[in-house]
Amino acid sequence: MNFLLTWIHWGLAALLYFHNAKVLQAAPAHGDGDRQQSEVIPFMTVYERSVCRPIETMVDIFQEYPDEVEYILKPPCVALMRCGGCCNDEALECVPTELYNVTMEIMKLKPYQSQHIHPMSFQQHSKCECRPKKETRIIQENHCEPCSERRKHLYKQDPLTCKCSCKFTDSRCKSKQLELNERTCRCEKPRR
């Protein structure tokens, strides 16, 4: 049975390889069939290709379906339109603004048990924009002084009011037969 799966795996790989080889022979390099390899690509062409936009991207199926580990998936990755490219500011990132789902047939193999073609849904991006990076927004919003320089790990802070409170709760301390000291935010032995 393992021998048969190996032959199926290699047969599919060969089929994909020869199909891609035919496509690459038929397609002009970089979209411009009349360009020579030593020719310099003009700035505007380079710039237009680099802007934030939906680009065909190879995506690992396990990245989209991490719980499918009991199967061998063929192919293991799929071509999807995803946002890619550059923004003109380091504080910006290329993100999707419009999404849609596409369903593809994927072969699911369960070693020594079964194999079947199964429809799987994937998210594609149809429009992209440059928007502020999440880390940048968090840094701009965080205007509060830290609760404690030495023991930051003991406190949590409300980002809107800057109010500090203990991460540990009184009930958590009591479950360990301790009491919460609200001044130090530590669980301590009860005083007698």
From Swiss-Prot:
Signal peptide per UniProt: 1-26
UniProtKB keywords: Angiogenesis, Developmental protein, Differentiation, Disulfide bond, Glycoprotein, Growth factor, Heparin-binding, Mitogen, Secreted, Signal
Pfam families for the chain: PDGF (PF00341), VEGF_C (PF14554)
Residues bearing glycans: N101
Localization (cell): Secreted
CDD domains with a match to the protein in the record: PDGF (cd00135)
Summary of the function given for this chain in its UniProt record: Growth factor active in angiogenesis, vasculogenesis and endothelial cell growth. Induces endothelial cell proliferation, promotes cell migration, inhibits apoptosis and induces permeabilization of blood vessels.
Name of the protein: Vascular endothelial growth factor A
